[in-house]
């Protein structure tokens, strides 16, 4: 198993989109009270006194939608300024990027992943649960702005949902031909969206690869990331195609990450909900960071067992209690 040096940090569980796979329609969401969110000071304390001493050097800011977090640019600046920070990135829906991308880049954010599940305005709005004025154009402009200010690599995250956007696989893959963009197809997961998942199921990565292969051919890329994606290229293309196959092709041996929710729960495995520890409450109760560090060290020691043996028994009820937006997936 890879060294665990990567922490995904959810800044907020709220979002200005309501994507079906992340915040399912009809599911009642109990949003975290602002007073229960980790404050900037608490988060920086945990990073500096708990995670960095244990070897964490790569940090990704997620949500919900992280750009809704008040003061997010200053938080980026503070994390980027830590001498041990080797990599600081963000996952966003892109809607606010057209006015925030430059400031984020100048603050020290160098890599960005943007969710883009459709190039069709109507389909895009359907997936994100938007019934008012379309949000497609502003999102697309945000992607363009992020690339123009210098984010490299710029990655686009795509979840293919049967019967909704599976007809766009070729169009989305084609974005990598003339642009140095990296499109990543992520298999749809049954976390907090059991009804939609049961209704729609998922498209295996190999089926997506085969669709692309039949159109243009597909070769393994010499560009490799530091995560679970299998990386390919369309011959002659400038960008890459990544496939994250958490449903069809177990990659637990390559896992190098943990997740910290916006309210301070540390989750060692995305699929395991029972092995989490509550760092925020302990911190607010005055537990020393040295003790918290030892608790995290213990979780690190058993993470391989959680990944390999407890991956499929990650809930006590058989149903995940939190949605992707609440976990910071």
Curated annotation (Swiss-Prot):
Belongs to the radical SAM superfamily. MoaA family. CDD domains: Radical_SAM, Twitch_MoaA. The keyword Iron applies. SMART domains: Elp3. Gene3D superfamilies: Aldolase class I (3.20.20.70). Its cofactor is [4Fe-4S] cluster. This is GTP 3',8-cyclase. GO terms for biological process: Mo-molybdopterin cofactor biosynthetic process. Its EC number is 4.1.99.22. S-adenosyl-L-methionine binds at residues 21, 64, 115, 189. Keywords: 4Fe-4S, GTP-binding, Iron, Iron-sulfur, Lyase, Metal-binding, Molybdenum cofactor biosynthesis, Nucleotide-binding, S-adenosyl-L-methionine. Signal peptide: none annotated. The gene is moaA. Catalyzes the cyclization of GTP to (8S)-3',8-cyclo-7,8-dihydroguanosine 5'-triphosphate. GTP binds at residues 8, 60, 91, 155, 257-259. It comes from Rippkaea orientalis (strain PCC 8801 / RF-1). [4Fe-4S] cluster 1 binds at residues 15, 19, 22.
